Amino acid sequence: MNILHSTLSTWRDRLAPVSRTSTFRTTGQITPEEFVLAGDYLVYKFPSWSWADASSPAKRVSYLPPGKQFLVTRGVPCHRRLNENFAGDAGHEDEIVRDMLAGDDGDGWLRTGGGRDLAEGHADRTGDVRTVDEAGNIGEREEGDDEEEEEIPDMEDEDDDEEAIIREPAGTSSTTQPIRTYNLYITYSNFYRTPRLYLSGYLSPSEPLPPHLMMEDIVGDYKDKTVTLEDFPWFDGGVKMATVHPCRHASVMKTLLDRADAALKIRRDKLKQAHSPAEASRISAERGLEGLVDETRGLSLGEQQQQGGGGSGGDEWEVLQHDEEDQVAIRVDQYLVVFLKFIASVTPGIEHDFTMGV
């Protein structure tokens, strides 16, 4: 079934009419020219990514230039397997990113991360709370007052205590072993007019990971639905890879673009209401694109200022300070960076940010 689907998908992309009209802001889709522009930006900002050509001229697509048929980064580490507990939490408590339009529960993208465990952990941390008055005096516990406070043992007393050593029970398998690496490929889907991600895993530099084992690194709700095993269309010989189907990419990207623009508008409004240069400076230094991604550490997505350099936002998203009403939070050349941030929810064990290290 996957072979038939892969063949149909390849021919559908090659035979679909090529769009030359930009609808980036209104649909979340991009043209082949915009894909090349976004790819050039990704390669420039993050040299671990590079352009690559098809394995033979017959495998090239006509709407992309030779030598820029797809993007690739190699040796991305994957330190953990996604067990059934992780997948179960993803199915129960995770948030679905919607495009704000009417539709069924499938019209969106699942934001993963073990929401139930995080919520329970948060409840555990907040259940035993003490208050502190203005003088710095610590009050009694809000809950559990009748429980005696445990004595904190001296670590030096535990150095030779065999019972204090935590050992992993025999026969149990850790979700952090063995370490795998992945080659990631970003292609352009001409039918859906969005990027598409392919993954090829390795147990060692010389030992490819069998395709069915790649599914161990995919969130359970996506296996055989959003993620399937298909031949990579740009290689001869039928190289099987895991691929994230692009049918929802445009709507999710549109949602993220809208959120980023809304966050930029909020920041502009705050700057207008600032009462002092110091307050304006503090607002400008705040993290941009609120609600787009939960973490952006390690990324440097904004171009450096041409004059004057510096600024605390150098490792964050660039938000220009001049107050232009038509200014957007994310340019089309930054498209693939945002794409990689949301696609990471499918494979949270793979360190996508590793490919963006500066």
From Swiss-Prot:
Quick one: a GO biological-process term for this protein? autophagosome assembly
The family note in this entry says:
Belongs to the ATG3 family.
Q: Where is this region: Flexible region?
A: 85-176
Q: Does the keyword Protein transport apply?
A: yes
Q: How does it assemble?
A: Monomer. Interacts with atg8 through an intermediate thioester bond through the C-terminal Gly of atg8. Also interacts with the 40 amino acid C-terminal region of the E1-like atg7 enzyme. Also interacts with the atg12-atg5 conjugate.
According to the UniProt entry, which residue ranges have a biased composition of type Acidic residues? 142-161
Q: Which gene encodes it?
A: atg3
Q: Name one GO cellular component term.
A: mitochondrion
Q: What is known of its domains?
A: The N-terminal region is involved in phosphatidylethanolamine-binding and is required for atg8-PE conjugation. The flexible region (FR) is required for atg7-binding.
InterPro entries xrefs: Atg3/Atg10 (IPR007135)
**Location of the active site:** C247
Please name the taxonomic classification of the source. Eukaryota, Fungi, Dikarya, Ascomycota, Pezizomycotina
Quote any Pfam family the record assigns. Autophagy_act_C
Q: Which UniProt keywords apply?
A: Autophagy, Cytoplasm, Protein transport, Transport, Ubl conjugation pathway
Domain of life where this protein originates: Eukaryota
Renumbered to this chain, region (Handle region) spans: 251-334
The principal localisation class reads cytoplasm
Source organism per entry reads Aspergillus clavatus (strain ATCC 1007 / CBS 513.65 / DSM 816 / NCTC 3887 / NRRL 1 / QM 1276 / 107)
Name this polypeptide is given: Autophagy-related protein 3
Which compartment or compartments is the protein found in? Cytoplasm
Ranges of Basic and acidic residues composition bias in the record: 117-133
User: Its Gene Ontology molecular function terms?
Assistant: Atg8-family ligase activity
Region (Disordered) residue ranges read 112-161
Function as written in the Swiss-Prot or TrEMBL entry: E2 conjugating enzyme required for the cytoplasm to vacuole transport (Cvt) and autophagy. Required for selective autophagic degradation of the nucleus (nucleophagy) as well as for mitophagy which contributes to regulate mitochondrial quantity and quality by eliminating the mitochondria to a basal level to fulfill cellular energy requirements and preventing excess ROS production. Responsible for the E2-like covalent binding of phosphatidylethanolamine to the C-terminal Gly of atg8.
